[in-house]
Amino acid sequence: KYTDKGWFCYELCVPEPPEVTEIVDGSCLVRIKPLSKEQREMSERCVQGLGYQGNNLLCSNWDTDHMEKLDYNGIYEYLYAMKHQKAFDAEDYPNGIPKEEFESLIMEYLPVTAEQIQEYAVFDEKNQTYVWVRLGCLNYAPTFFGTSLPEVIDIKENEDGTVTLTVDAVCDMVICDDAVITHELTVKFADDGSFQYLGNEILDDG
């Protein structure tokens, strides 16, 4: 089928149990109608590095008055990868992430104070470190939504200088859904090219 958002979904014939012991995904989702250059750039710059797995920045409702809703310990590794262009290596921090290092990165991308981060995140006050736990079979169950890819489909410049990005969570596995959820992410860009996330709203109850 061809979707209204410009995706073509088809399904391959794949073996099924009992021929195989594991389910084989034959679903394929291909974008036919291209995004604009600006939409592609915004997708890569602001949302693709975050995704919907291991953090809740893009998949929960929050704003500058409700910063306590974010999972700061989960968000850290994704912001780290965005800033440094390399994966966060937990082996470098066997005893937790040092306070100053954790807080400075979070405050670079989110409008929170060090005091708020200590209150909202899991903070080891004795050792002055923040806890980080790798996702695994004991603390995470993969979902189709979690593996979805965020894609900016609309960009709106607001009068207050912020920008609202309309984002679709595109799932190309099994369910082949070009918008598992749609949400509006508000960001503010600085003259030097840096930016902060200011809020997220799930549209139509997800």
Where do the model's predicted regions map?
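Mature, Sec-exported extracytoplasmic domains of Gram-positive
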Residues: 1-206
